[in-house]
A protein has these predicted regions:
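A compositional/structural signature for long, glycine/proline-rich flexible linkers
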Residues: 1-214
Length: 214
């Protein structure tokens, strides 16, 4: 990892992903050895939804959605209580997170240059539009072997992205066009669709059901 956030894509550039036409994604490939940590230092954005998600080389994801990110002392999380955006947070990606540890995500295991893991910062419906000019992306610091290195911002953000494909039953369950969709339950105002409705491989949003209910 030589620089931070080499890939950015949104409806204005790639016109992909779900469920918001006003989404912005920032992507970082991860190739990390044992003991490496990645620390994200960021600001809560003015947006409908935001999350930090990591994926293994096979596409299995873990997420910290907006409301679960604890603010730094003296800051407030606007998804937890009424507050202006701009509060500070710190999130750590590490290989040995304790169960229930706040602001921590698991480091993708088994990453190589040919099969990297992925770090994604998702922001839906940011005020003022998407892109780096409107969304304050977190600063990335790599900690390894007792030293810390803050990654400089990439000079461009159009690096090619080749998301992993979900294989086996997960891929077949999420693939569209192979049969009729199951009807929703009757006499219910709200129901939770199966995750396979949305997960068609690649870097699927772990928080899709939460976003739809928000």
């Amino acid at each position: 990892m030589s620089c931070a956030w080499p890939a950015e894509f949104s409806a204005q550039t790639d016109n992909i992903a779900f469920p918001d036409a006003a989404e912005t994604y920032f992507l970082q490939q991860i190739v990390a050895s044992a003991g490496t940590r990645i620390v994200l230092s960021g600001l809560f954005p003015d947006a409908r939804y935001a999350s930090i998600q990591v994926y293994t080389p096979s596409g299995v994801g873990a997420s910290l959605p907006d409301y679960r990110i604890a603010p730094q002392p003296g800051s407030l999380n606007p998804w937890r209580q009424q507050a202006a955006p701009g509060g500070r947070f710190t999130v750590t990606i590490r290989s040995d997170p304790a169960p229930g540890q706040a602001n921590t995500l698991p480091m993708p295991a088994g990453t190589t240059s040919q099969h990297p893991g992925y770090l994604m910062y998702r922001v839906y419906l940011p005020a003022g539009g998407g892109g780096l000019s409107a969304v304050p992306v977190p600063v990335l610091t790599v900690e390894q072997g007792g030293s810390a290195r803050t990654l400089p911002a990439c000079s461009s953000h159009n690096a090619p992205v080749h998301p992993p494909a979900v294989s086996g039953s997960a891929a077949s369950a999420g693939a569209g066009g192979s049969g009729a969709a199951a009807p929703p339950p009757r006499q219910l105002e709200f129901f939770k669709p199966p995750q396979s409705t949305f997960n068609n491989g690649g870097l699927a949003n772990v928080d899709t059901s939460y976003v739809l209910a928000y």
